[in-house]
Amino acid sequence: MSADMSFFHLISGASLVVQLVMLLLLTVSMVSWTMIFRRRSVLQQARIAADEFEDRFWSGGDLATLFREVTAQSEHAIGMAGIFQSGFNEFARLRKQPGADPRAVVEGAQRVMRVALSREMDDLETHLSFLATVGSTSPYVGLFGTVWGIMNSFRGLGTANQATLQMVAPGIAEALIATAMGLFAAIPAVIAYNRYSNDVERLINRYDNFLEEFSTILQRQAHV
């Protein structure tokens, strides 16, 4: 209990600038943790959805039937299902045109799927740049608070008749808390950014591989 009181006493006794730095780092840390948990849920759902759709796609069923099933679930599907939905819809539309060139039909479907893939990339990478920024800047913000606090401590020595450790220790301790809070905000953000960036890259590779495989299937169907 005394340690907790001492900790909060140091924070309450810090200078206004150091307190503002601590408040900023605490706020950033809370926002960062919120985004970490949200991104974890989003990426986990995206992996599960991709697994389920691939099972349905490669089950050997009719593509038109699969398209109707996907569209019945959502007119604007996301993930791998969204890429399939966009591509097959464009393929069917272009193929109905009189005198449609099979190559042009497939290329049109590929362009639409590339656009859908780009949208999925943007959605998957949402908030990752924020985590990267938190991870790279928080230690420096904390260091700024530490330097400011130490400057105040040594400034106080200038007006003292006798310099003692007891006089500067509280100021240095409260200043170092800012550095600790900066690291507390930065370390989880860096770990999450590296982990989620890897997860996003693997998902995008899966989407891209599916796009190429689906394009090959459409090429065969276009010449039927």
Segments the model singles out, each with a brief description of its role:
Residues 1-55:
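Hydrophobic membrane-targeting segments
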Residues 21-31, 138-141, 145-148, 183:
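Residue-level signal for the membrane-embedded core of alpha-helical transmembrane segments
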Residues 23-24, 169, 177, 181:
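Alpha-helical transmembrane segments of multi-pass inner-membrane proteins
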Residues 25-28, 190, 194:
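Alpha-helical transmembrane segments of multi-pass membrane proteins
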Residues 48-141, 150-164, 191-224:
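Predominantly long cytosolic amphipathic alpha-helical stalk/bundle segments
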Residues 161-175:
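Hydrophobic alpha-helical transmembrane segments and adjacent short intramembrane/lumenal linkers
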Residues 175-191:
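Hydrophobic alpha-helical transmembrane segments of polytopic membrane proteins
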